[in-house]
């Protein structure tokens, strides 16, 4: 198994650089890498084997592979495969496929990292590859958004690196388990870096602009897979070190509510989806034992929604209310939205049930309220007007690659629901349907007619950096407490 694992993790980097030598085969080589990752991730999900590899020595690179890794690898693989299919006939250059596959491989590397320094290297490569993909259109706007992302990411990783060095100074090891007994400042610095990288709470306010302004396939990769790279190490550490669990739950619940509030009042479809990503990351992080399944359900649904949103006649909700959407497009959007809302027979139902069942009383109540907020958010998409056969809808003709990508993701959403069959009890079914109904009623009677423009000042670069300082102070106090 170790030989297969090493070959699998090296394959994206080998193929990524080989694409430059064989540019005519770029799409096919990228497809092979994505399919290989689907096979590897599926194997780990269906037949989980927990293994730990020390590649160099006790202080070197450590890899940990288990069912949690499997869920996240499968998420990354399916999202990447869908993006490759989506881009199949769009004329993307070899440079795009190279960066997409290197990004894919780096994200996979994060999901099997077992030490802080290997994680640092993988996260830095992700930052560079994501920067190049965001800047791919080469417009002034895209270049600025990419530079903003890179600056925030690198600043966060500087804090993280200092914390990792302090852990090594204490234990003479970079292993995640070294967080137990590490100095207060080490825990605070590492958490600040990962909270920012993962888009958690106010540290994640860089996310709406970045994900909404990137090209459609890049947005799908960022929200569907890349954001998990900041959350995964926090989940892994929480499973290893019980003391940090309560602190992470507070951040998770605050994140879920912050994202929901921003998403409810957002008037732009892509910004709404990006804000909801912040909220859903709170759900992923709040119950570490169920994080893998929730990340899979969210990643598949969110990638679907970003791919569809990029092909709607407008990004403005007011204009979409006046322009009916073609029925096939609406069906895809509705299925993905219902999955995130927690409808039975879709992956989101089992993920939400598993997550909420693991929480304490007050945490459970808070996340149930956040779940109602999620239903309100996605009611905005579900209740958009549908074009009748006799009515004209948006005139675009969509290529085969678009529908292949959407079908892959939707089929995966339905199939993934089979991974959580024990959650299908009468009580859970009633609670799920009641939550969605409450959200729809509140949307129909309150938020459909109520508009509020939230300030975007906290998203400005100088405020994002300033927020890091305030968050670091808060983390110090929470760790000391």
Set out the residue ranges of the language-model regions:
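Alpha-helical transmembrane segments
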Residues: 9-13, 30-41, 77-78, 101-105, ...
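Alpha-helical transmembrane segments of polytopic membrane proteins
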Residues: 3-8, 68-74, 248-249, 364-369, ...
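Hydrophobic transmembrane alpha-helices and their helix-loop junctions in integral membrane proteins
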Residues: 82-90, 94-98, 102-118, 129-389
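Alpha-helical transmembrane segments and their helix-start/interface "positive-inside/aromatic belt" motifs
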Residues: 18, 23-34, 144-150, 326-330, ...
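Cytoplasmic/organellar membrane-interface segments at the starts of transmembrane helices
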Residues: 315, 326-329, 384-481
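Transmembrane helix-loop-helix hairpins at membrane boundaries of multipass inner-membrane proteins
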Residues: 1-92, 97, 205, 476-481
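Juxtamembrane membrane-water interface segments that cap and precede transmembrane helices
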Residues: 51-64, 204, 351-361, 420-426
